[in-house]
């Protein structure tokens, strides 16, 4: 089974594809989608095009996305919500469904602590996947963590 994890953002989005076979997880691919356009009306199609490339190149069985958080700037929160709405529509059209996890759920799933730092989550994501090299930026490890969190839920359902 291939799981796509997404860490949404307004300028850059982390994504990660992991495989789940016989209870074991492995990283297939992870990366960053950079949004270069300045206006929302051009940013969203740019993001959709990037994801369509990922969908074409991989057989994806399950998708998980990190839920929205409240930013200190209301404009940023609104823009992130608009991007998530576009992503959600795209995922429903492509896969029929997707799962959502809050940052707290992801942190707890990987570290056991809902107040873990991004660096602690990144450390555990790399450890669980036996990755030795550094992965930057943290948007990528956040997406990996979302995918791992979903893999844990899938494993529980299979038992």
From Swiss-Prot:
SUPFAM superfamilies for the chain: Ribonuclease H-like
A GO CC term attached to the entry: Holliday junction resolvase complex
EC number from the UniProt entry: 3.1.21.10
Cofactor mode of binding and number, as noted: Binds 2 Mg(2+) ion per subunit.
GO terms for MF: crossover junction DNA endonuclease activity; DNA binding; magnesium ion binding
UniProt-annotated binding residues for Mg(2+) 2: 66
Residue ranges of the TM segments: none
A single BP term in Gene Ontology: DNA recombination
Keywords of this entry: Cytoplasm, DNA damage, DNA recombination, DNA repair, DNA-binding, Endonuclease, Hydrolase, Magnesium, Metal-binding, Nuclease
Required co-factors: Mg(2+)
Subcellular location: Cytoplasm
CDD domains: RuvC
InterPro entries in the record: RNaseH-like_sf, RNaseH_sf, X-over_junc_endoDNase_Mg_BS, X-over_junc_endoDNase_RuvC
Catalytic activity: Endonucleolytic cleavage at a junction such as a reciprocal single-stranded crossover between two homologous DNA duplexes (Holliday junction)
Active site: 7, 66, 139
Listed PANTHER family: CROSSOVER JUNCTION ENDODEOXYRIBONUCLEASE RUVC (PTHR30194:SF3)
Function noted in UniProt: The RuvA-RuvB-RuvC complex processes Holliday junction (HJ) DNA during genetic recombination and DNA repair. Endonuclease that resolves HJ intermediates. Cleaves cruciform DNA by making single-stranded nicks across the HJ at symmetrical positions within the homologous arms, yielding a 5'-phosphate and a 3'-hydroxyl group; requires a central core of homology in the junction. The consensus cleavage sequence is 5'-(A/T)TT(C/G)-3'. Cleavage occurs on the 3'-side of the TT dinucleotide at the point of strand exchange.
Assembly and oligomerization: Homodimer which binds Holliday junction (HJ) DNA. The HJ becomes 2-fold symmetrical on binding to RuvC with unstacked arms; it has a different conformation from HJ DNA in complex with RuvA. In the full resolvosome a probable DNA-RuvA(4)-RuvB(12)-RuvC(2) complex forms which resolves the HJ.
Protein family per UniProt: Belongs to the RuvC family.
Designated name of the protein: Crossover junction endodeoxyribonuclease RuvC
Organism for this UniProt entry: Sulfurimonas denitrificans (strain ATCC 33889 / DSM 1251) (Thiomicrospira denitrificans (strain ATCC 33889 / DSM 1251))
Taxonomic lineage from the root: Bacteria, Pseudomonadati, Campylobacterota, Epsilonproteobacteria, Campylobacterales
């Amino acid at each position: 089974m291939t799981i796509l994890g997404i860490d949404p953002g307004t300028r850059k989005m982390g994504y990660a594809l992991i495989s789940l076979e016989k209870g074991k997880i492995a990283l297939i691919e992870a990366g960053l989608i950079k949004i270069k356009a300045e206006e929302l009306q051009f940013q969203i199609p740019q993001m959709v095009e990037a994801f369509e490339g990922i969908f074409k190149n991989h057989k994806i069985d399950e998708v998980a996305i990190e839920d929205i958080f409240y930013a200190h700037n209301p404009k940023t929160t609104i823009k992130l919500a608009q991007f998530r709405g576009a992503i959600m529509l795209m995922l429903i059209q492509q896969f029929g469904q997707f799962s959502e996890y809050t940052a707290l759920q992801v942190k707890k799933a990987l570290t056991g602590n809902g107040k873990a730092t991004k660096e602690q989550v990144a450390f555990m994501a790399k450890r669980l996947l036996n990755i030795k090299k550094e992965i930057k930026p943290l948007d990528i490890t956040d997406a990996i963590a979302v995918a791992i969190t979903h893999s844990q839920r899938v494993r529980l359902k299979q038992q």
